[in-house]
Structures are given as C-alpha cells and as structure tokens.
Amino acid sequence: MSRYTGPSWKQARRLGLSLTGTGKELARRNYVPGQHGPNNRSKLSEYGLQLAEKQKLRFTYGVGEKQFRNLFVQATKIKGGILGFNFMLLLERRLDNVVYRLGLATTRRQARQFVNHGHILVDGKRVDIPSYRVTPGQVISVREKSLKVPAILEAVEATLGRPAFVSFDAEKLEGSLTRLPERDEINPEINEALVVEFYNKML
C-alpha cells in the first residue's frame, strides 16, 4: 500500500483524528466524509478497531504501509520497554517528524518535503531521507541557502510552543531532540496496544 497523497482533511474526518495537529480538519465536520454524513458511523468489529487504530497512527506520521510494517518489525527486536511505545519512539525519531516537532514545518507532510528538497542538515551535513533516524543530541538545522525560504520562516513564526523533549534556537533556525519523549508527551489519542494486536495477527 502506497502513501496516501489525497486531501488530509478527508482522511482526518474518516479517522476522526487531526493529521495536521491543528484540528482544523474536524472543526466544522467531525464525521466521516460521504453521502450519509454523521449518520454513517457504524460499530466496528475487534479487527476493525485494530485496523482503524493502525491507520490513525500510520497517517499521523504519513508513512507508507510497507515502511510502517517494517518499522514495527524493527520495534519487536528492541530489548526492554513496551513494544507499542518502542514502535512510537521509532516513528518519533524520523527526521521529518523531528523537523515538524521543532516547528520548522507546519505539518509532517511539509517537513517531509523540506527534507526531500535538501533544506535540512543533520550535524552540518545535508540529509534528504525523511526516514533518517535522529539520535538525541544531533543538531538539526536549515541549510544556509534555505534560511530565507518563506515557508520555513512562516512555520517558525506560526509555532506557538514546542514539546519539552526538543530545544530550538529561532535565530539560528536549529535545534535538537534533547531526549526521547515520555508516553504522555506524544499522541495521547492513540491506543498503540491495538496496533500491536493488529500486527501480532498479521506477522
């Protein structure tokens, strides 16, 4: 299954979850899209609940199904901790996600574009792979030639607050993942146990 590239608002309404972090997609119509509107929500089976939760997490980070599944397999090989949370930490450490958390982009999709276009440096070296795994302490910055890209400057200006697990210097347009987040600091609306149950049946 390839990465979803359609309207984020439609996918957000289908999942009942804001994918941009702004909540704007659900502000006016917080029901699934389609002809029957708010009367179209049906009771999901156990499998349906697990699938829906997996999709919520996958679309939140904007990761394709194959890559998402492979990341889960990697999480199963991590010793210690809780599998579901370990999986979420791997998603959090993606470069595109860290760029988003730092406020260098307004959405993860935009952050992925910035990385793909070569605007982002890791420890002074250009990295154009959105899935690059960031290690706490690495410095994420904007390439010198990209310091005046309007979309980046607008994103920084629009960011009102940042998570406690990142640090950011607005003048230098650089920051870092200072530590791994705690569970209550990320995606409280996600029940990762259902995602684990889904993949335990599939793998």
From Swiss-Prot:
Gene3D superfamilies the record matches: Ribosomal Protein S4 Delta 41, Chain A, domain 1, RNA-binding S4 domain
A Pfam family reported for this protein in Swiss-Prot or TrEMBL: Ribosomal_S4
Alphabetized GO MF terms: rRNA binding; structural constituent of ribosome
PROSITE patterns documented for this protein: RIBOSOMAL_S4 (PS00632), S4 (PS50889)
Keywords from the named record: Ribonucleoprotein, Ribosomal protein, RNA-binding, rRNA-binding
GO biological process, one term: ribosomal small subunit biogenesis
Keyword Ribonucleoprotein included in the entry's annotation: yes
InterPro entries, per database record: Ribosomal_uS4 (IPR022801), Ribosomal_uS4_bac-type (IPR005709), Ribosomal_uS4_CS (IPR018079), Ribosomal_uS4_N (IPR001912), S4_RNA-bd (IPR002942), S4_RNA-bd_sf (IPR036986)
The organism's place on the tree of life at top rank: Bacteria
Keyword RNA-binding assigned: yes
Signal sequence region: none
S4 RNA-binding domain: residues covered: 93-156
CDD domains named in the record: S4 (cd00165)
Record-level GO cellular component terms: small ribosomal subunit
SUPFAM superfamilies per record: Alpha-L RNA-binding motif
Family under the similarity heading: Belongs to the universal ribosomal protein uS4 family.
Function: One of the primary rRNA binding proteins, it binds directly to 16S rRNA where it nucleates assembly of the body of the 30S subunit. With S5 and S12 plays an important role in translational accuracy.
Subunit structure: Part of the 30S ribosomal subunit. Contacts protein S5. The interaction surface between S4 and S5 is involved in control of translational fidelity.
Stated name of the protein: Small ribosomal subunit protein uS4
